């Protein structure tokens, strides 16, 4: 019983101490998505869908929820963001070739159609895409892909 008491106190102290150690935040501003939006020309509705459902994990600007102030949850969130940006980062759009941009949009379509994006862990507190928003997003992504496919054909000539 004595060891359980000491262990509990140690655990509580550890929890308190880690509250003062925070990971770096992903807050570099929405200007980092401007090239992506300039090239893909989303409507205002699609831009809002992207901002509300995609940019938190797939851009250099994250709108953090209140629970990000609690360690170790904030470390878990940062890992999700790093992983999301590793797979699809609209803030790095200018570094992608036309082929890669087409492929990234193809993956976006695939993951949204299969219900894999947005992640369930994200939608628990942020809400999910409505069926209409999903269809609108998919149509926009397909149209955007056509532009990149045209660019690839031009380069092949």
How would you label these PLM feature ranges?
Residues 114-116, 123-152:
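C-terminal capping alpha-helices of c-type cytochrome domains
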Residues 66-72:
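Short cysteine/histidine-rich zinc-coordinating motifs and their immediately flanking basic loops
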Residues 50-61, 117, 137:
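The canonical Cys-X-X-Cys-His
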Residues 1-39, 143-157:
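Post-cleavage N-terminal segment of exported redox proteins
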Residues 75-123:
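Extracytoplasmic electron-transfer domains, predominantly the class I c-type cytochrome c fold
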Residues 40, 44, 48, 99, ...:
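Soluble non-cytosolic domains of exported or imported proteins
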Residues 42-55, 77:
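Sequence/structural segment immediately N-terminal to covalent heme-attachment motifs in c-type
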């Amino acid at each position: 019983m004595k060891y359980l008491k000491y262990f509990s106190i140690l655990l509580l102290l550890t929890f308190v101490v880690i509250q003062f150690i925070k990971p770096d935040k992903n807050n570099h501003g929405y200007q980092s998505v401007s090239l992506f939006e300039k090239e893909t020309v989303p409507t205002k509705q699609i831009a809002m869908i992207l901002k509300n459902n995609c940019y938190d994990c797939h851009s250099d600007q994250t709108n953090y929820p209140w629970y990000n102030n609690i360690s170790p949850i904030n470390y878990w969130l940062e890992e999700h963001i790093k992983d999301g940006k590793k797979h699809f980062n609209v803030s790095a759009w200018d570094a992608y070739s036309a082929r890669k941009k087409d492929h990234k949009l193809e993956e976006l379509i695939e993951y949204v159609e299969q219900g894999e994006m947005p992640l369930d862990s994200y939608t628990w507190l942020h809400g999910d895409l409505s069926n209409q928003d999903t269809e609108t997003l998919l149509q926009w992504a397909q149209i955007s892909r056509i532009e990149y496919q045209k660019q690839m054909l031009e380069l092949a000539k």
